[in-house]
């Protein structure tokens, strides 16, 4: 199995190193990741300048672009064959609920999915963690499952792993996305040159962490596996909007 690995934390991040090592047990791994941290880059593509592709000493490839750039470039311009799977991560921090809208980790997997490849985004639910081995093993397990029981159509899975040893994980739970409260306000600051600058505030706390959510699963020690889709249409509002337009 040919596996394309990417992330949004950069090619030097410990999470992607652990992920690539674990996935080598189930397939031929190629790593193409951003040259620097591109967290919260979402699904952005770089259109205002050319991209460069370079190879690091450890064999990883890195691109001066976004996570989406990395997967798009690899699949459409670098690799000789379409990968059998795209795996993005392991992200240093959760990607649950509304996080998925902004996440570069999820975006890299989404780009693979859009290009017709089954894809998984894997995140470790901790900003303080230094051991990514459990999350990497979960990714390996899921990739191995794909080889044994392939889906008939490409699938996009968002996976969040509690920060605990692999042996202490309570299993996998298929979930829906929860929802966060709105983000904290931006933080105003003044530089030594007396310039006013702003830092984006922290993500909001969970507003919907109820039954069936990714938040609940992780809090209870389960790995959250959420199937995602691309269609943003609010089908339930189509009749109401049509009536409103027709007035």
From Swiss-Prot:
Enzyme class: hydrolase
Main location (coarse class): cytoplasm
InterPro entries attached to this UniProt entry: SurE, SurE-like_Pase/nucleotidase, SurE-like_sf
Necessary cofactors: a divalent metal cation
Annotated keywords: Cytoplasm, Hydrolase, Metal-binding, Nucleotide-binding
Catalysed reactions listed for this entry: a ribonucleoside 5'-phosphate + H2O = a ribonucleoside + phosphate
Localization per record: Cytoplasm
Entry EC number(s): 3.1.3.5
Molecular function terms, GO-annotated: 3'-nucleotidase activity; 5'-nucleotidase activity; exopolyphosphatase activity; metal ion binding; nucleotide binding
Coiled coil regions in record: none
Chain residues that bind a divalent metal cation: 8-9, 39, 91
GO cellular component: cytoplasm
Biological function: Nucleotidase that shows phosphatase activity on nucleoside 5'-monophosphates.
Family under the similarity heading: Belongs to the SurE nucleotidase family.
Protein name listed in UniProt: 5'-nucleotidase SurE
Organism: Aromatoleum aromaticum (strain DSM 19018 / LMG 30748 / EbN1)
Gene (name only): surE
């Amino acid at each position: 199995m040919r596996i394309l690995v990417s992330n949004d934390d950069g090619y030097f991040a410990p999470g992607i190193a652990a992920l690539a090592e674990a996935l080598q047990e189930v397939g031929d791994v190629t790593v193409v990741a951003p040259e620097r941290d591109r967290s919260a880059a979402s699904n952005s593509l770089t259109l205002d300048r050319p991209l460069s592709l370079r190879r690091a000493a450890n064999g990883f490839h890195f691109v001066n672009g976004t996570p989406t750039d990395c997967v798009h470039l690899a699949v459409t311009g670098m690799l000789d064959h379409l990968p059998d799977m795209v795996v993005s991560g392991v992200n240093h921090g959760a990607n649950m609920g509304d996080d998925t809208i902004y996440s570069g980790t999820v975006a890299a997997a989404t780009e693979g999915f859009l290009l017709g490849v089954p894809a998984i985004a894997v995140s470790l639910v901790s900003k303080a963690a230094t051991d990514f081995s459990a999350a990497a093993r979960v990714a390996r397990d899921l990739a191995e499952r794909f080889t044994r029981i392939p889906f008939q159509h490409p699938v996009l899975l968002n996976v969040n792993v509690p920060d605990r040893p692999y042996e202490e994980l309570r299993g996998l739970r298929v979930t829906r996305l929860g929802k966060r409260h709105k983000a904290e306000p931006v933080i105003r600051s003044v530089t030594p040159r007396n310039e006013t600058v702003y830092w984006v505030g922290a993500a909001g706390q969970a507003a919907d962490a109820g039954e069936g959510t990714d938040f609940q699963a992780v809090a209870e020690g389960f790995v959250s596996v959420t199937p995602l889709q691309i269609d943003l249409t609010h089908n339930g509002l189509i009749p109401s909007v049509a009536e409103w337009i027709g007035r």
